[in-house]
C-alpha cells in the first residue's frame, strides 16, 4: 500500500509543564515580529531614518496591532465566543487573530507615533511594509501547527492532513486539505522580493509608494487564497477578507497612480 504524502502538523505545543505551555503559534508570531523589525531597521538608513527609530515604532505597532487583530477576529466570530468562558476572548495563544485587524491597529498606532514624534507617516510605513510582509510569511506557519486556515479537500502531493477534531462540520470523511497557510506564506515571500527590488531599484519614488505596492500585491494574493479557505470570517454570505482585499487592491492601485501622477506634475517643466 503506497504511503501518503503531504504535511502533518506535530501539534500546537512545543512543551508543556503543568499548566504552563509554550505554543508554536505564539513563538512564530514573536519570530515574525523580530525578523520584521530587523529587516526594517536594516532598510531605515536608505531613507535617512535612524534604525533605533524603527525599534520605537515597532513597539507602538505591536501595542496597536495585536489587540486590534484579536478584536477584529472575535467580532466576526462572536457566535462562537458567546458560548465560551469570558477569558477565551483574550486567549490569543490558542490562535484566532486577523491580519487585517492588525494592519488597521498598526496604522492607527503608527499615525499616533509619527504625529507625536514629528516623523513622516508615509516614510515610516514604507519602511515598515517589507518587515510586515516578512513577519506575515513567518507567522502564517502558526496556522500549520494549529491545524487551521486550510482550504478545500485535495489529493495533491502537498496536501495537509487535518485531525478529525479540526475538520469542518460534515467533512469528517475528508482527511487532506489545501495548505492555504503555505500558499500565503510563499506569496508573501514573493511580495517581499518585489518590495525589496522596488525599494532599492527606484530610490526616488514618492514616500508611500512601497506601502501602496504592499497593499496592492498582498491583497491580490489574499483575495485568491481566501477563496480556497473553508474557515473564512464572514459578513452574511461574503468573505470578510476578500472584501477588505478588494479595498486594499483599489487603495493600493489608486495610491500608486496618485503618487506617480503627483510626482510627474512636479517634475514637469
Swiss-Prot record:
<protein>
    <recommendedName>
        <fullName>Phosphatidylglycerol--prolipoprotein diacylglyceryl transferase</fullName>
        <ecNumber>2.5.1.145</ecNumber>
    </recommendedName>
</protein>
<comment type="pathway">
    <text>Protein modification; lipoprotein biosynthesis (diacylglyceryl transfer).</text>
</comment>
<comment type="function">
    <text>Catalyzes the transfer of the diacylglyceryl group from phosphatidylglycerol to the sulfhydryl group of the N-terminal cysteine of a prolipoprotein, the first step in the formation of mature lipoproteins.</text>
</comment>
<keyword id="KW-0808">Transferase</keyword>
<feature type="binding site">
    <location>
        <position position="140"/>
    </location>
    <ligand>
        <name>a 1,2-diacyl-sn-glycero-3-phospho-(1'-sn-glycerol)</name>
    </ligand>
</feature>
<feature type="transmembrane region" description="Helical">
    <location>
        <begin position="14"/>
        <end position="34"/>
    </location>
</feature>
<dbReference type="Pfam" id="PF01790">
    <property type="entry name" value="LGT"/>
</dbReference>
<keyword id="KW-1003">Cell membrane</keyword>
<dbReference type="GO" id="GO:0005886">
    <property type="term" value="C:plasma membrane"/>
</dbReference>
<feature type="transmembrane region" description="Helical">
    <location>
        <begin position="208"/>
        <end position="228"/>
    </location>
</feature>
<keyword id="KW-0997">Cell inner membrane</keyword>
<feature type="transmembrane region" description="Helical">
    <location>
        <begin position="49"/>
        <end position="69"/>
    </location>
</feature>
<feature type="transmembrane region" description="Helical">
    <location>
        <begin position="89"/>
        <end position="109"/>
    </location>
</feature>
<keyword id="KW-0472">Membrane</keyword>
<comment type="similarity">
    <text>Belongs to the Lgt family.</text>
</comment>
<dbReference type="InterPro" id="IPR001640">
    <property type="entry name" value="Lgt"/>
</dbReference>
<dbReference type="GO" id="GO:0042158">
    <property type="term" value="P:lipoprotein biosynthetic process"/>
</dbReference>
<keyword id="KW-1133">Transmembrane helix</keyword>
<feature type="transmembrane region" description="Helical">
    <location>
        <begin position="118"/>
        <end position="138"/>
    </location>
</feature>
<feature type="transmembrane region" description="Helical">
    <location>
        <begin position="240"/>
        <end position="260"/>
    </location>
</feature>
<feature type="transmembrane region" description="Helical">
    <location>
        <begin position="180"/>
        <end position="200"/>
    </location>
</feature>
<keyword id="KW-0812">Transmembrane</keyword>
<dbReference type="GO" id="GO:0008961">
    <property type="term" value="F:phosphatidylglycerol-prolipoprotein diacylglyceryl transferase activity"/>
</dbReference>
Amino acid at each position: 500500500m503506497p504511503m501518503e504524502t503531504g504535511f502533518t502538523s506535530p501539534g500546537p505545543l512545543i512543551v508543556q509543564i503543568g499548566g504552563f505551555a509554550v505554543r508554536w503559534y505564539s513563538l512564530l508570531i514573536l519570530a515574525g515580529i523580530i525578523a520584521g523589525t530587523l529587516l526594517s531597521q536594516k532598510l531605515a538608513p536608505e531613507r535617512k531614518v535612524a534604525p533605533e527609530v524603527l525599534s520605537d515604532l515597532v513597539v507602538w505597532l505591536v501595542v496597536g496591532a495585536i489587540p486590534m487583530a484579536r478584536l477584529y477576529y472575535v467580532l466576526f466570530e462572536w457566535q462562537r465566543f458567546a458560548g465560551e468562558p469570558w477569558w477565551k476572548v483574550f486567549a490569543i495563544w490558542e490562535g484566532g487573530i486577523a491580519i487585517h485587524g492588525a494592519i488597521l491597529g498598526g496604522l492607527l498606532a503608527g499615525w499616533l507615533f509619527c504625529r507625536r514624534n514629528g516623523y513622516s507617516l508615509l516614510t515610516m510605513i514604507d519602511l515598515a511594509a517589507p518587515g510586515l510582509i516578512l513577519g506575515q510569511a513567518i507567522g502564517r506557519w502558526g496556522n500549520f501547527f494549529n491545524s487551521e486556515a486550510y482550504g478545500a479537500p485535495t489529493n495533491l502531493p502537498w496536501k495537509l492532513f487535518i485531525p478529525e477534531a479540526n475538520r469542518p462540520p460534515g467533512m469528517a470523511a475528508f482527511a487532506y486539505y489545501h495548505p492555504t497557510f503555505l500558499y500565503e506564506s510563499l506569496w508573501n515571500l514573493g511580495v517581499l522580493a518585489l518590495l525589496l527590488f522596488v525599494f532599492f531599484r527606484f530610490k526616488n519614488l514618492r514616500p508611500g509608494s512601497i506601502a501602496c505596492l504592499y497593499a496592492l500585491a498582498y491583497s491580490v494574493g489574499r483575495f485568491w487564497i481566501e477563496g480556497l479557505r473553508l474557515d473564512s470570517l464572514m459578513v452574511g454570505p461574503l468573505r470578510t477578507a476578500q472584501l477588505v482585499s478588494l479595498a486594499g487592491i483599489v487603495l493600493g492601485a489608486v495610491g500608486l497612480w496618485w503618487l506617480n501622477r503627483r510626482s510627474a506634475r512636479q517634475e514637469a517643466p
